Amino acid sequence: MQFLDQAKIYLRSGAGGPGAVSFRHEKYIEYGGPDGGNGGKGGDIVFEAVPGLNTLIDFRYTQHFRAARGASGAGSNKTGAGAKDLVIHVPVGTQVLSEDKEEILHDFTKVGERIIFLKGGDGGRGNASYKSSTNRAPRQHGPGWPAQEAWVWLRLKLLADVGLVGLPNAGKSTFLKATTNAHPKIGNYPFTTLHPQLGVVRRHGQEFVLADIPGLIEGASEGIGIGDRFLGHIERCRILLHLIDASGEDPIAAWHEVQNELALYGAGLAEKPQLLALNKIDSVDEETCAELSQALEEASGQKVLLLSGATGQGLDPILDQLITMTGRAIEKAQESSAQTEKIWSPI
């Protein structure tokens, strides 16, 4: 499946239908009064977050969305039919931004979340509604209220329990493939992964969503290598699994580089719960592995887990710890949500 995490689209709601100009025509009634009905309401533009979507690729091919106009009114005081709403399905995690990207207009965080983004115009008045004691045969009518239109950006920030971070070629895709049902492209060169990949880890009757974020480089927080878009996906992850390549030139510098980019980007990325693993330990000898592990623990101030995504060594302890950490993170989020609801309860 192709991945697209932002798209610019044009939206236009439906205009209201015009009111009718009509007069009652019946046998033996010489001067039938006005009986023109009102026009129908135009269709709304509606966004709805649905399950099963994790890309905005459909918006690459369809970029203009127009709801239908309301039907015209008719004689015998018949109101025109209202137009159907145009419902646009988006993945959970989608943000709707203004055309200049300066304002977040809505943020979809739950399946089934639905908003009316642009309202359709009301129908115009038929001439029957203009009748008065001084105007028995009005011929004026309302044309219907105009449509609303807007250019907006859709931006997707993936919702995942655990986000894999690290420099390019740190072994993130290999880890994803070894632990989930995902089939990412794997290669022994930097930037093999060009788009975020999702997989589901199932273990001991529990499961969590794992996201492979493309490798970060120095300057990613400023947009170099579109790294700011990749960092945006990390915002929604509850926990980060930071993989360090044991066979890299300077694993300690690699750790500092990624941590620095997380801090520079902001949005609380550097404060997220993090698990640190020294990957590709099968490519170095035991002495080197021990030295690197100790140096990383001193630099980071946290325990370093040893891992080889290729051979499977060290996978089980990491997955067990991630399950524990995601459970705590979910409980904490639920408690926070419950407290917020309690604070704002009108009772």
From Swiss-Prot:
<feature type="binding site">
    <location>
        <begin position="166"/>
        <end position="173"/>
    </location>
    <ligand>
        <name>GTP</name>
    </ligand>
</feature>
<keyword id="KW-0963">Cytoplasm</keyword>
<feature type="domain" description="Obg">
    <location>
        <begin position="1"/>
        <end position="159"/>
    </location>
</feature>
<keyword id="KW-0342">GTP-binding</keyword>
<dbReference type="InterPro" id="IPR036726">
    <property type="entry name" value="GTP1_OBG_dom_sf"/>
</dbReference>
<dbReference type="InterPro" id="IPR006073">
    <property type="entry name" value="GTP-bd"/>
</dbReference>
<dbReference type="InterPro" id="IPR006169">
    <property type="entry name" value="GTP1_OBG_dom"/>
</dbReference>
<dbReference type="InterPro" id="IPR031167">
    <property type="entry name" value="G_OBG"/>
</dbReference>
<feature type="binding site">
    <location>
        <begin position="279"/>
        <end position="282"/>
    </location>
    <ligand>
        <name>GTP</name>
    </ligand>
</feature>
<feature type="binding site">
    <location>
        <position position="193"/>
    </location>
    <ligand>
        <name>Mg(2+)</name>
    </ligand>
</feature>
<feature type="binding site">
    <location>
        <begin position="191"/>
        <end position="195"/>
    </location>
    <ligand>
        <name>GTP</name>
    </ligand>
</feature>
<dbReference type="InterPro" id="IPR006074">
    <property type="entry name" value="GTP1-OBG_CS"/>
</dbReference>
<feature type="region of interest" description="Disordered">
    <location>
        <begin position="124"/>
        <end position="144"/>
    </location>
</feature>
<feature type="binding site">
    <location>
        <begin position="212"/>
        <end position="215"/>
    </location>
    <ligand>
        <name>GTP</name>
    </ligand>
</feature>
<comment type="subunit">
    <text>Monomer.</text>
</comment>
<dbReference type="InterPro" id="IPR027417">
    <property type="entry name" value="P-loop_NTPase"/>
</dbReference>
<protein>
    <recommendedName>
        <fullName>GTPase Obg</fullName>
        <ecNumber>3.6.5.-</ecNumber>
    </recommendedName>
</protein>
<keyword id="KW-0378">Hydrolase</keyword>
<keyword id="KW-0547">Nucleotide-binding</keyword>
<dbReference type="Pfam" id="PF01926">
    <property type="entry name" value="MMR_HSR1"/>
</dbReference>
<keyword id="KW-0460">Magnesium</keyword>
<feature type="domain" description="OBG-type G">
    <location>
        <begin position="160"/>
        <end position="327"/>
    </location>
</feature>
<dbReference type="GO" id="GO:0000287">
    <property type="term" value="F:magnesium ion binding"/>
</dbReference>
<dbReference type="InterPro" id="IPR045086">
    <property type="entry name" value="OBG_GTPase"/>
</dbReference>
<dbReference type="GO" id="GO:0003924">
    <property type="term" value="F:GTPase activity"/>
</dbReference>
<dbReference type="GO" id="GO:0005525">
    <property type="term" value="F:GTP binding"/>
</dbReference>
<comment type="similarity">
    <text>Belongs to the TRAFAC class OBG-HflX-like GTPase superfamily. OBG GTPase family.</text>
</comment>
<dbReference type="GO" id="GO:0042254">
    <property type="term" value="P:ribosome biogenesis"/>
</dbReference>
<feature type="binding site">
    <location>
        <position position="173"/>
    </location>
    <ligand>
        <name>Mg(2+)</name>
    </ligand>
</feature>
<comment type="function">
    <text>An essential GTPase which binds GTP, GDP and possibly (p)ppGpp with moderate affinity, with high nucleotide exchange rates and a fairly low GTP hydrolysis rate. Plays a role in control of the cell cycle, stress response, ribosome biogenesis and in those bacteria that undergo differentiation, in morphogenesis control.</text>
</comment>
<dbReference type="Pfam" id="PF01018">
    <property type="entry name" value="GTP1_OBG"/>
</dbReference>
<feature type="binding site">
    <location>
        <begin position="308"/>
        <end position="310"/>
    </location>
    <ligand>
        <name>GTP</name>
    </ligand>
</feature>
<dbReference type="InterPro" id="IPR014100">
    <property type="entry name" value="GTP-bd_Obg/CgtA"/>
</dbReference>
<dbReference type="GO" id="GO:0005737">
    <property type="term" value="C:cytoplasm"/>
</dbReference>
<keyword id="KW-0479">Metal-binding</keyword>
